[in-house]
Design a protein with these regions (language model features):
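Short beta-strand immediately N-terminal to the catalytic nucleophile in serine-hydrolase-like folds
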Residues: 174-176, 206, 329
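Alpha/beta-hydrolase-fold enzymes
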Residues: 1-33, 39, 165-169, 187-293, ...
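Alpha/beta-hydrolase active-site loop
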Residues: 146-167
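Catalytic histidine neighborhood in serine/cysteine hydrolases
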Residues: 295, 345, 349-384
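Alpha/beta-hydrolase fold nucleophile elbow
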Residues: 163-180
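Short beta-strand/loop motif that positions the catalytic acidic residue
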Residues: 322, 328-330, 334
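Conserved alpha/beta-hydrolase "acid-adjacent" motif
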Residues: 335-341
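Short, surface-exposed "cap/lid" segments of acyl-processing enzymes
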Residues: 45, 49-141
Length: 444
C-alpha cells in the first residue's frame, strides 16, 4: 500500500496541469508577452541540466567555496584517505576545556553547518567559546571501492583520539548528523565495548536514526530489485551522488523537482542564488560496498538495534551499552529521518538523554540560528514512552534550539582555558596543511 501511495503521489505531481505549457495560464501569458523567449531560455536551461546530469535549483556561479560559503576561518590539520580534519580559529580569549568534534553526513558536504556567517552553526559554536573541529569526508572514487562501515567507525574513533591528543584533554563532545549520527551511535557502542567510553563526554544526534522500522518513504527503495539496480549503477566501486540527489528530490517532488521545471524550464526565470540549494546540489559519491550494506543491513533488515547482529571489526555492536549523555534532535516535518523514527533512539541508549523536537525538517530544523528568530522547538522533561506522549506534554519555545543545546553542553563541563597554544589551528603538534574548507570538499 505504501508503495502504491508513493507512486500515485509522484504520478499526480508529475501530471499536474501546471507542469505543461498549454495548461498553465501563467506560462501561456508569459509566452505571449515574450514571444516565446521564455521557452527558448527554458530549453537552454534544460539542455545545460541534461549535460550536467542534474536538475539545477540555484545559480551555481554565485558561490565560491571559502569566500561566501564554507568561509569560517580554520585550518586542515590532518588528512587521511577518507577524511580531512578541520580545526577552527577561536574568536574568544577563553574557550571551554572540552572541545567539540562534529561528524557531518558523507552523503552531503559538511558545509551545511557553515553556509554563511548568519546561518553557520560552526561559526556560532566558535563564538560561544567552543573549540570546534569538523570532519570533511572525501567524496568516493574508485580507490574507495572497498570502504565499508567499519572504516567510517574507525575514522570517527581516530578523529576523537586525534583531538584528545592534540589538546591534551580527557574527552570531547561529539555531534553526528544523519548517517554520521547513526555511525556515532555505533562508535559509542564500540568504545563502550572496549572500555573506552570515557573518551566522549557527550553525544549529540542531529536527525539520526538507529531503529529503521519506521524510517519513512526511503524504506520503499530497499527491496531486492532496487538494491540490484543500485549495484548496477555502482560498477566503478562508487555510486554517483547525482543518483542519491534525485532520490531525495523525489521524496518532495512538487517542491524539489516540478517547481523548477515550471519556473525555469517553462517560465524561463533566472535561477536565484540560494546557499542552501547550492549545497543541496553539491553531491558526493558514495562507496558502493558501504552503501549496499547500509541499505541492506540497516534500512531493510534493521540489524543495528539487535545486540551483536553487527560488528565493527571483531567488536560486536550493542547500543544498550552506551551510557554517554545524549542530546537528540529531531525535525517535526523531516521527510528523510521522520521524527518518530529518530525518537526510537531513546529506547536503545542507557545514559541520560534529552530529546528536542524542532520545527521544520531535515535541514532547516537543524540550521536555525537564534538571530533568525524562526520556527520553534518543543521540550518535555517528563519521562515518555512514545513521541506522541512527548508532544502531548511538551512545552513549545519560540525560536532556535541552539541555546538549549549550549546550556546542555555546559552542564557536561563548563571549565575554560586560554585560547592559545594548540587551541590555535596549526600551533600545536599538528601543523596546518591548508586553509579551511580544505580540498576534499571541493573534489567532485
Amino acid at each position: 500500500k505504501a508503495k502504491i501511495r508513493f507512486a500515485t503521489r509522484g504520478l499526480v505531481e508529475a501530471l499536474s496541469p501546471a507542469n505543461f505549457p498549454f495548461t498553465n495560464p501563467q506560462v501561456l501569458e508569459k509566452t505571449l508577452e515574450t514571444g516565446g523567449d521564455n521557452l527558448v531560455r527554458g530549453l537552454q536551461f534544460m539542455l545545460e541540466d541534461i549535460e550536467r546530469g542534474q536538475l539545477r535549483q540555484t545559480d551555481t556561479d554565485a558561490f565560491e567555496m571559502g569566500v561566501n560559503i564554507a568561509a569560517t576561518p580554520g585550518k586542515v590539520i590532518k588528512e587521511t584517505p577518507l577524511y580531512q580534519l578541520i580545526q577552527y580559529e577561536p574568536t574568544t580569549k577563553k574557550v571551554f576545556e572540552t572541545p567539540l568534534v562534529i561528524f557531518p553526513p558523507w552523503i552531503n558536504r559538511f558545509y551545511i553547518l557553515d553556509l554563511n556567517p548568519q546561518k553557520s552553526f560552526i561559526r556560532w559554536a566558535v563564538e560561544q567559546g567552543i573549540s570546534t573541529f569538523i570532519v570533511s569526508w572525501k567524496s568516493a572514487d574508485a580507490s574507495m571501492a572497498d570502504v565499508v562501515w567499519d572504516d567510517y567507525i574507525a575514522a570517527q574513533i581516530d578523529a576523537i583520539a586525534t583531538v584528545r591528543d592534540l589538546l591534551g584533554v580527557e574527552n570531547v563532545h561529539t555531534i553526528g548528523y544523519c548517517v554520521a549520527g547513526t555511525t556515532l551511535a555505533a562508535t559509542l557502542a564500540v568504545l563502550a565495548a572496549q572500555d573506552a567510553a570515557q573518551c566522549v563526554a557527550s553525544a549529540t544526534f542531529f536527525t539520526a536514526q538507529v531503529d529503521f522500522s519506521e524510517a519513512g518513504d526511503l524504506l520503499l527503495m530497499v527491496d531486492d530489485r532496487q538494491l540490484a539496480m543500485i549495484e548496477q549503477l555502482s560498477g566503478d566501486g562508487f555510486l554517483d551522488g547525482r543518483y542519491m540527489a534525485a532520490t531525495f528530490n523525489s521524496l518532495r517532488g512538487r517542491d524539489l523537482i516540478w517547481n523548477y521545471v515550471v519556473n525555469n524550464y517553462l517560465m524561463g526565470d533566472d535561477y536565484p542564488p540560494f546557499d542552501l540549494l547550492y549545497w543541496n546540489g553539491d553531491t558526493t559519491n558514495l562507496p558502493a560496498k558501504w552503501h549496499q550494506s547500509y541499505l541492506r543491513d540497516l534500512y531493510r533488515d534493521n540489524k543495528l538495534v539487535v545486540p551483536g547482529q553487527m560488528h565493527a571489526g571483531s567488536t560486536p555492536i550493542d547500543l544498550t551499552r552506551i551510557q554517554t549523555p545524549a542530546y537528540i534532535q529531531a525535525g517535526r516535518e523531516d521527510h528523510i529521518a521522520p521524527a518518530n523514527s529518530v525518537w526510537k533512539i531513546m529506547h536503545h541508549l542507557r545514559g541520560p538523554k534529552r530529546f528536542v523536537l524542532a520545527g521544520s525538517g531535515h535541514i532547516a530544523g537543524v540550521v536555525n540560528p537564534p538571530a533568525a528568530q524562526k520556527y520553534q522547538y518543543w521540550v518535555n522533561d517528563a519521562p515518555c514512552d512514545t513521541l506522541d506522549q512527548f508532544v502531548a506534554g511538551a512545552r513549545e519555545i519560540k525560536g532556535s534550539w541552539w541555546g538549549d543545546w549550549l546550556d546542555w553542553i555546559k552542564g557536561h563541563g563548563d571549565s575554560t582555558v586560554a585560547a592559545k597554544g594548540a587551541r590555535i589551528p596549526g600551533k600545536g603538534k599538528l601543523k596546518a596543511i591548508e586553509d579551511a574548507p580544505g580540498r576534499y570538499v571541493k573534489m567532485r
